[in-house]
Design a protein with these regions (language model features):
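Mid-to-C-terminal secondary-structure elements
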Residues: 1-5, 9, 134-150, 162-295
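Generic structural signal for small/hydrophobic residues in well-ordered secondary structure
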Residues: 28, 38, 59, 75, ...
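Membrane-helix entry/capping segments
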Residues: 2-9, 13, 17-21, 26-34, ...
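Structured, solvent-exposed hinge/loop segments at the ends of secondary-structure elements
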Residues: 49-179, 186-194, 247, 259
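Hydrophobic membrane-insertion alpha-helices, especially the h-region
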Residues: 39-53
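Small-residue-rich transmembrane alpha-helices
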Residues: 47, 274, 355-382
Length: 382
């Protein structure tokens, strides 16, 4: 599009621009219906193309906003040919994290978020809130490298600590600093949470949600091998091989003590481990207890192909409309030749006409894209 506009500008400088524009507006007046159909057809094609490409880009860049995303891995349990699961127990995760110096940091996240009811006190007045919270171990801030606006990557080290997304902090505390403020639970048996940090909101295409992250109790299921209820992520050193990390763990971990004397890694009725890079988790399917957003690479490839087919069809349509008008425009073109217009000027006017119609259709499609999210047709939950 930009190349076409640039080319037309160069051509126009060498041609009679006044004549070209006069011919262009004359065509619009004479063939109003055809011009409107051309513009609408192209603009709808542009809208469809851009909407599809936005979705494709959304999924292909999922979790790419995290620094060193390719060095972050989720550890899944594989049950032979029976499938796999995304959750793990805390002592197993602790043993894995400490098994190799190649693992820079590890963290656990509860498999599901929960709603928390709390209130804050300000000048003797109580204001109640209900917000989603995710119970995590302190290492989450270092594995995923939260962009901390207040506080640091050690903000969850102490019990009853929480970090808030910027949007939530502004909603609750306005322009005041949130650090040090208490979130008092509606449950009198639960200790108040203390805000220790504020992080910049994650983009929508991230597995991490813009919720309150609460520090997991150090005693919670610490040695409980029967509670498999956590997502487990590790961050490896730059250039480290995940296969080497897995082999090292399997060689040194006393699996028989944990799972029984008959346990063997990778056996049909036994367990195995799988490390999946953070961006690939989005495309990993058929994993039990995996509540993270999913997409299919095959579906995205189909969408990508459809987007370009739409553009090609729109181009063919545009050409057909222009060709259909040729018999009605022959007289006008011959008249211009008689009046002295050169072939170059006539070709230039046709080129300007095509580019102007395309440019106007493109601008109209941008207007449609601006309006669509404000209509009931837009899916607010997407």
């Amino acid at each position: 599009m930009l190349f076409g506009i640039f080319f037309v500008i160069i051509e126009a400088k060498q041609l009679d621009m006044k004549t070209i524009l006069r011919n262009f507006f004359s065509v619009l007046r004479r063939f109003k219906t055809a011009s409107v159909l051309n513009v609408l057809g192209l603009s709808i094609a542009f809208v469809a193309f851009m909407l599809i490409m936005m979705q494709v880009n959304y999924d292909y860049t999922f979790d790419r906003s995290h620094p060193n995303a390719d060095a972050i891995f989720r550890v899944d349990i594989v049950h032979g040919s029976k499938g796999s699961q995304a959750i793990i127990c805390r002592p197993f995760a602790r043993a894995f994290t400490g098994s190799s110096p190649l693992i820079e940091e590890g963290c656990l996240l509860s498999a599901w978020t929960e709603s928390r009811f709390f209130y804050i006190e300000d000048g003797g007045q109580r204001t109640s809130y209900k917000e989603d919270a995710w119970n995590v171990t302190p290492g989450v801030l270092e594995v995923f490298r939260f962009d901390m606006l207040e506080g640091s990557e050690r903000s969850l080290d102490e019990p009853n600590s929480v970090v808030l997304p910027e949007s939530m902090a502004r909603k609750i505390f306005g322009d005041e600093s949130a650090v040090g403020k208490q979130l008092i639970s509606a449950n009198p048996m639960e200790d108040a949470k203390i805000v220790k940090g504020v992080y910049k909101d994650f983009p929508r295409n991230s597995a991490l949600k813009n919720v309150m992250y609460t520090s997991m109790s150090p005693k919670e299921n610490y040695d409980n091998w029967g509670n498999w209820n956590y997502f487990f992520f590790v961050r490896l050193g730059e250039g480290m091989d995940k296969a080497e990390v897995l082999d090292n763990f399997k060689r040194n971990f006393n699996a028989k003590e944990a799972f029984g004397n008959e346990f063997e890694w990778g056996e049909e009725n036994s367990l195995d481990l799988r490390l999946t890079s953070l961006p690939d988790v989005h495309f990993l399917s058929n994993v039990d207890f995996d509540s993270m957003p999913k997409a299919s690479r095959q579906t995205l490839l189909v969408l990508f192909s459809i987007a370009f087919v739409i553009l090609i069809i729109a181009g063919i349509n545009f050409t057909n409309f222009s060709t259909a008008l040729t018999p009605m425009r022959i007289k006008s073109i011959n008249t211009q030749k008689v009046l002295g217009s050169s072939d170059r000027t006539l070709r230039g006017s046709l080129l300007v006409e095509a580019v102007c119609v395309s440019l106007f259709a493109y601008l109209l499609s941008l207007l449609f894209l601006y309006i669509i999210p404000k209509t009931p047709c837009s899916s607010q939950g997407a």
